[in-house]
Amino acid sequence: MEMLYHSVSDLVRLANEHQIPLWKVVLLADVQERQVTVEESFETMRQMYQAMRQADQEYDGSIVSASGMAGGDGEKLHAYNASGRSLAGGYMGLVMEKAVKMGESNACMKRIVAAPTAGACGVIPAVFLSYEEYCKETENRMVEALFVSA
C-alpha cells in the first residue's frame, strides 16, 4: 500500500482508508522511502528520542556559551519550578525549563537536538520529554507521537 502524503488531510485520509493510526501512516511512508523494515524505522525514531532524553539529562547549568550570553538559565528555571511559585504550573513550567536547557546546550556546543530547527532546537524535545514525565507516558507512545510530529 502506498503511503504518499503532502498534507495533514492526506495523512488523515490514509489513516481512515487503511484503518491505522496517523503515526503508522508516517512510519509506513518512511519504510517505503528508505526501504527498511517497520522495526528498523521504529528503532531509528526511538534512537532519536533517546538522544533527546540524553541531551536533557546531560544538561550542565555551569557551562556558559563562548559569548557568555547563554548558560545557567535552565537551572534557574528548574529552581523556580521547584519553589512551587511558578505561574505557568507544572507541565508548562517543565516544558519551558526543558526548552531553555536544550537551547543552552545547543548554544554551548553540547549535543544539538535541532527539532524542528536549530533556531527552535528545544521545542519538540521539551514538549515530548515533559509530557512523558508529567503524564507518565511510555517511551513507545512517545516514539509514535514523534512520527506524527515528523
Per-segment meaning from a language model:
Residues 107-110, 121, 137-143:
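Short coil/turn connectors at secondary-structure junctions
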Residues 143, 147-150:
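A structural-propensity feature for long, helix-poor, extended segments
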Residues 125-136:
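Alpha-helical support elements that line or immediately flank enzyme active sites
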Residues 109-127:
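Conserved phosphate/anionic-ligand binding catalytic regions in large, soluble enzymes, centered on
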Residues 1-110:
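Generic N-terminal targeting/processing segments that precede catalytic cores or assembly contacts
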Residues 87, 116-121, 133, 144:
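Glycine- and small hydrophobic-enriched segments that form the cores of compact globular domains
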Residues 95-98, 123, 148:
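Amphipathic, well-ordered alpha-helical segments in soluble domains
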